[in-house]
């Protein structure tokens, strides 16, 4: 004997009676709330169906606080071909129309009658399988010539109602078939075992930095957009020293040409030199038509002192010795040894 057992205790909540049997196909309940049809519940597969608030124990869940966990049972009598409703000692009762049923006492439910559970506003109406051919068509075959009048008066409303019921029933039946097909298919098909990943939580000791600019302040946010070039310091220093040496040597030559008279600095100028740039006593030269001071930053150092009496001996120069072209040409720097080759120091300089 099949029985519904409460999970919290070993006492059975409902004992299926021996007279219970499988109902005919197409038997169902119309669930109506107000004037709106919510759904159709098919009840043609089992001997009994349980109604209540507990979804684990009941076949149809009643989501209302006034209903008990296992509220009532709907059983089909195989000998009487009738449906019976049994209240399972519910707190707020089970109603057939407006009549409350006695607990644990089967009550016959006629077709098209309405039942309700507790204070729920949903009404459950017992229905048979809707007929494929409407009743008006069967009456046409019997009555013959009077069919047109009855068809106009009673045929259309009845056909529309039966068509709606048939549509709703087929919808509920198709839902049940799809559900059963999925469940049976799940039993036959062996699902491949999924390799479960390790569900344990592990922590890595190494910190993986994705954006270093968020951690290190020295790293810029736009470092990928900046191009860097490496210039060797040694090469730069060599270039700087070489350029400075050339400029310094050039300036020294310019200073030598502007201020120092060389070997013939003490001689008076000739007629061709009177129109050229004059040399000032205090180190001034005409640059761009204006006298500008130009100091000598690197004066020449004479290793052997020049005898002052040598210049005073011959105050008047020989005109044939001087060459005007040689005076205008740039003079090179000459040392004392090269300027006076073979000259020996006099005894007066050594004293």
UniProtKB/Swiss-Prot annotation:
Residues 314-351 are annotated as: Disordered. Has a basic N- and C-terminal and an acidic central domain. The FHA domain mediates interactions with threonine-phosphorylated MELK. A motif (Nuclear localization signal 1) lies at residues 185-209. The modification Phosphotyrosine is found at residues 264, 335. Residues 1-142 are annotated as: Interaction with CDC5L, SF3B1 and MELK. Residues 49-101 form the FHA domain. A motif (Nuclear localization signal 2) lies at residues 210-240. Gene3D superfamilies: 2.60.200.20, 6.10.250.1290. This is Nuclear inhibitor of protein phosphatase 1. Disruption phenotype: Mice display a retarded growth and embryonic lethality at E6.5, due to defects in proliferation rate. May be inactivated by phosphorylation on Ser-199 or Ser-204. It is found in: Nucleus; Nucleus speckle. The keyword Ligase does not apply.
